[in-house]
Amino acid sequence: MRLPAGKYFVADPCYIIRDEKYDRLLEETNYFGYTLPDRGCIFIDSVTKLPFAVFSTAYGDGCYRDGFGFKYGVDAGCISCVPVAMVDEHTSSSEYINLVSFDEPFEVGYNDGMITFGHIEIQTKGDYDEYQEDYQEELDA
């Protein structure tokens, strides 16, 4: 599965998409395809006609890191790669929103807990207690 080149927000979609649009996308995508074998996929926004990707994490909510050390706080059980042009105004100035530029079309996917958006790889499966400890530290901060 591939998305076109461009600027994207990589984050839990509930941090970057406003309430009404978020509710519409949940309905249109059957809750971001949480029951699909690949735990998500590429969807097309019915309003902007832009493609975006969403994949469920292995353990649901928590705090997950990519290979570069960026932390992704997750409260909706998934991580997305959403074109900046699709987002009117994100809901939060959260430190968990990663703005990434992709110079050419890139692969997205999920494999045994690893969510991949081009060069961004986010491991969501492993030591569950470690993820929960990171998440609790973030909540307490």
How should each PLM-predicted stretch be described?
Residues 1-141:
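Intrinsically disordered, low-complexity acidic regions enriched in Pro/Ser/Thr
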